[in-house]
Design a protein with these regions (language model features):
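A hydrophobic/aromatic-rich effector-binding and dimerization subdomain
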Residues: 8-16, 80-141, 171
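N-terminal regulatory/effector-sensing and dimerization cores
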Residues: 22-114, 147-151
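Bimodal feature
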Residues: 59-65, 130-134, 149, 154-157, ...
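Short, Lys/Arg-enriched, Trp-marked, Pro/Gly-tolerant hinge/linker segments that flank
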Residues: 124-126, 144-154, 165-193, 197-211
Length: 213
């Protein structure tokens, strides 16, 4: 099945603007017959109501309220528009931020947008979820009162959201890596104990493999 290309209208608010916040129930109207689509911009989707499957480049997640899904330009997305009833999409183009920093790849270096990122999903705490939704509301208000060329507050608000998400994502991945190391260390310890106990009578690798399972 082919995917529909979603191209953002830079002139939606009259003057060119490279950032927007839209409700998912509004986005649904533009997903023609199929919910499979490809974006030409960065998208951070916040689920606020309902739950259902949400796929990003063949990785499928069961999305629930307070979940965040990250998408890069060119990635194929598909989500259950019937059961995920609402949320917000924070969408922006790289150049809106990149020229402000010495690092022209600032956006690509965010933990959740890196090529090697382990997951496109992050679940927010109640406190962080509330704080970010308030900031999204501020972004929307700033956009609604937008004057051409006056993007400094918008950039600051977008930067705040990205940094909060980056910190939370790094915390999530460090916890997962810690769990993985703990499991690995437990296996090593168990193996060493088995060898110490049975080394004299058991020399088969299969014996120890069976005991570790």
């Amino acid at each position: 099945m082919g995917s529909e290309m979603c191209i953002r209208d830079r002139h939606k608010y009259g003057s060119e603007l490279l950032v927007d916040v839209v409700e998912l129930k509004y986005v649904k109207k533009f997903l023609a017959k199929s919910a499979v689509h490809t974006l030409n911009y960065y998208d951070i989707t916040f689920i606020t109501e309902g739950k259902g499957a949400f796929s990003v480049d063949n990785q499928t997640y069961e999305a629930i309220p307070r979940d965040v899904l990250f998408s890069k330009p060119g990635e194929i997305r598909n989500w259950d528009t019937h059961h995920i009833t609402n949320g917000y999409a924070l969408i922006f183009e790289e150049e809106f931020l990149s020229f402000l920093f010495k690092d022209s790849l600032f956006v690509q270096h965010l933990s959740f947008f890196q090529i090697e990122s382990s997951s496109s999903l992050l679940h927010l705490s109640d406190e962080l979820y509330t704080r970010i939704l308030e900031t999204l509301h501020d972004i929307k208000m700033e956009i609604d009162s937008y004057q051409q060329g006056d993007v400094h507050v918008l950039r600051a608000l977008l930067y705040e959201v990205l940094m909060l998400l980056d910190r939370a994502y790094l915390k999530m991945t460090s916890i997962e890596e810690g769990r993985s190391r703990e499991v690995s260390n437990n296996h090593v310890s168990k193996f060493m104990n088995l060898v110490a106990t049975h080394a004299k009578e058991q020399h088969s690798v299969q014996y120890y493999a069976d005991k570790l399972c």
